[in-house]
A protein has these predicted regions:
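Extracellular or lumenal secretory-pathway regions
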Residues: 1-303, 310-518, 545-546
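Non-transmembrane, juxtamembrane loop and terminal tail segments
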Residues: 494-562, 572-575
């Protein structure tokens, strides 16, 4: 019986050990598989195939434009009246060229060929709609000249010369661009003012490149695309997608000394907890930021944690006093990174519709224009829904609003005589021009595969742990009971030469000497002493047979001897 108990105990301990060790083995195997899938260290990795060409997973782009409805009044000093129109939806496709790895395959360098395809079916209207707002062919060059005019007198002279061109001969054509939305956002070829400025090297080409880069040809790409680089996740997976080079710069922008520190948002060091502050390089804001957790979320059944841009990023002082001469609360000033063009980035619609306690866009900025916003529930926040086990972003939405100023323009002619244009306009009057939202999410199929593979293995891991631990504990409990009973028998009858009597039959408490029980002529009484007593002094040999009360079998007592008093003793008289 004690042997049975020991065996059960050993089996139980083995089950407990398996329940403790196997899940960690499964977890390690799962993480290794996920690591192999997400790393970018070779062209054979699954993640690289999507990274290098996202034709199966295009990024969504929604553009909302602020159409100026009172240009004549603005030229006479009136407050701009704007009507928000949209969305104009596009699919963004990226193909990586000039791909290379360092010798250790820890860093991946590339250039993206980016194009946008209009999605008319989901858009509010056609992107051939004519829109009007701030002129991106005029004001950027004016602000450069305004800042460094004495060093670049020729720039001012070329602007004056350009204002004599038929296409720019009126204040309206100088102050406003009136084009199709697609041309305004993505550019058009052969602008006469840019052609004039390009002759002196002030403009890169006669083509207006737009406010969002959309390469029109491979030649355009080769000439204008810049290099990016990121960590591949090898050998340290926690470095996966950490940006090391953005648009040829290792700093947040060319005119900054702050080194890039954060991922591109596609993944973060795993595991991700609610108390974490994942580091992001927000390229559109030229900022390193630490994201803030705001709540749990779910993407097609995959449980995620939602993180947003920190509220402190939008504050003027003291959090961002050193950041590019912040002007107003609620507006990120990226002027230094856009090469002297006054550029503010704000929350879309200045944060309209957000929690009032978090809406601190400076009223002085909002009051510089009147905007009729669309009444819809479209998401305007920038957020990342991060799967905490893998650190991968399952759903991303990134939004910002571009705000640029109108201004009075004064430039010299070839003789050095100054001329003022737009003299009645409100100087440095900031207006929102457009806002855009980029978004991407895992597909329903990918989410289902993730749930099946990752959650399936985790469920198996939990089931093995629970079953193994429960079975192990149960077997150990049974073993303890068996051992306790067995030890009780052993303790009660240790050192005795008799077996446990069968109380239901006195006859069964007798055995025969010299023969098997029931066959010899004289019985031997199994008394409760430490010996076998028999009547008479005859000897029947050295073997005494007794009946085992547990099995019913007749068993020999080896080395049985009889002393002068007629008592037998044996070395194996106790049976348990």
């Amino acid at each position: 019986m004690m042997g049975v108990g020991v065996t059960l105990c050993i089996i139980g301990l083995i089950c407990i050990a398996i329940s403790l060790l196997l899940p960690s083995t499964i977890d390690s195997a799962l993480m290794k598989a996920l690591q192999d899938v997400t790393m970018l260290d070779t062209k054979e990795s699954l993640a690289y195939s999507v990274f290098a060409n996202n034709s199966e997973y295009p990024i969504g782009l929604s553009v909302y434009f602020m159409n100026l409805t009172n240009p004549d009044e603005v030229l006479q000093g009136g407050i701009p009246e704007l009507q928000e129109i949209g969305p104009y939806n596009y699919k963004e496709y990226r193909v990586a060229y000039n791909v290379s790895w360092d010798d250790q395959h820890t860093t991946l360098s590339y250039r993206y060929y980016t194009t946008f395809q209009f999605d008319e079916e989901t858009s509010a209207s056609s992107d051939s709609d004519v829109v009007i707002n701030w002129n991106p062919n005029v004001f950027p060059f004016w602000f450069v000249y305004k800042q460094v005019g004495p060093l670049l007198p020729t720039l001012g002279q070329k602007l004056y010369e350009g204002f004599q061109l038929p296409e720019y001969s009126t204040d309206e054509s100088r102050a406003f661009m009136k084009r199709s939305l697609r041309e305004y956002i993505f550019g058009y070829p052969n602008d006469p003012l840019l052609a004039l400025l390009a002759q002196e090297g002030f403009a890169p080409s006669p083509d207006y490149s737009g406010v969002i880069r959309n390469f029109t040809s491979f030649e355009d790409f080769n000439k204008n695309a810049k290099q990016d680089a990121m960590r591949t996740g090898y050998p340290e997976i926690r470095d996966l997608r950490k940006v090391v080079l953005s648009q040829d710069s290792t700093t947040v922008c060319e005119d900054s000394d702050e080194m890039i520190d954060g991922t591109d948002g596609g993944a973060f060091p795993r595991p991700v907890k609610r108390t974490d502050r994942p580091k992001l390089f927000a390229a559109s804001f030229y900022r390193n930021v630490e994201l803030e957790y705001v709540g749990d979320s779910e993407v097609y059944g995959v449980k995620t944690l939602r993180f947003i841009l920190p509220e402190s990023m939008w504050r003027n002082s003291p959090e961002n006093q050193e950041k590019y001469s912040q002007i107003w609360n609620g507006a990120v000033n990226v002027t230094a990174c856009t090469k002297s063009i006054p550029t503010l980035l704000t929350r879309p619609r200045f944060g309209k519709g957000r929690n009032p306690s978090q809406d601190f866009t400076d009223p002085a900025l909002i009051a510089q224009s009147n905007v009729k916003w669309l009444d819809d529930n479209v998401a305007t926040d920038t957020y990342f829904d991060i799967e905490p086990i893998t650190g991968g972003s399952m759903n991303i939405s990134s939004s910002s609003q571009a705000v640029w100023p109108f201004d009075v323009i004064t430039v010299p002619d070839a003789n050095g005589v100054s001329h003022t244009f737009l003299q009645n306009i409100r100087p440095m009057n900031y207006v929102p021009v457009f806002w855009a939202r980029q978004f991407i999410s895992v597909s329903t199929k990918d989410a289902a595969d993730f749930r099946s593979n990752v959650y399936g293995m985790m469920d198996a891991e939990e089931a093995i742990f629970a079953a193994g631990l429960s079975l192990g504990i149960l077997l150990c409990v049974i073993a303890a009971v068996v051992l306790n009973i067995g030890y009780g028998f052993y303790y009660s009858y240790k050192n005795r030469t008799s077996v446990v009597p069968e109380f239901d039959s006195v006859a069964n408490n007798y055995a025969k000497v010299g023969e098997e029980a029931g066959t010899g002529p004289e019985p031997v009484h199994l008394d409760q002493s430490t010996s076998f007593a028999r009547h008479g002094g005859a000897t029947y040999g050295s073997t005494v047979y007794v009946k085992n009360p547990f099995t019913g079998e007749t068993m020999p007592l080896s080395n049985a001897t009889m002393d002068a008093a007629g008592s037998y003793s044996s070395s194996n008289a106790t049976y348990l």
